[in-house]
C-alpha cells in the first residue's frame, strides 16, 4: 500500500516537473509494484494543438429558453411543446400507471397458489369435522395400488 502511494506521488512530481519545463533528474525508483522512469513522463507529455478552435460567427443553435421559458424539449414551437408534454404525461401517468396497476391487481391467480390454500383449508375443516387425521402417511390409498407379482 505504501509503495503504491509513493509511486503515485513520484509520478505526479515528475509529471509536474516535465510540464513546467524543469530539468528532471534521471532517477529510477524501483519497487515490487511500480517502476517510474523519465521515459514514462516523456510519453505522457501533452502535444501542442496544431489547429486552433474559433467560435462560429453564425450560431446555428438558438437559445430556445429565450423564446419559450417553459421549454419541455418536445418541439421548438411553444404551443406544440406544451401539448406534446401534456400528451406524454397523460399517457405516461394516467393510462400506464392507473390502468397498468389495475390490470396487475386483477390478473388471475399465479400458479393457482390462492386456490391451493383454499382447497387445503377446506380439506382440513372436512377432516376435523369427520374425526379423520389431518394428514395421512400414505398419499395414495394402498388398497388401490396394484403391484406386480414377485417371481
Curated annotation (Swiss-Prot):
One Pfam entry name: ESSS
Key words, A-Z: Electron transport, Membrane, Mitochondrion, Mitochondrion inner membrane, Respiratory chain, Transit peptide, Transmembrane, Transmembrane helix, Transport
InterPro entries registered for this protein in UniProt: NADH_UbQ_OxRdtase_ESSS_su (IPR019329)
Positions of transmembrane segments: 87-107
Region named Disordered: 39-62
SUBUNIT field: Complex I is composed of 45 different subunits. Interacts with BCAP31.
Protein name listed in UniProt: NADH dehydrogenase [ubiquinone] 1 beta subcomplex subunit 11, mitochondrial
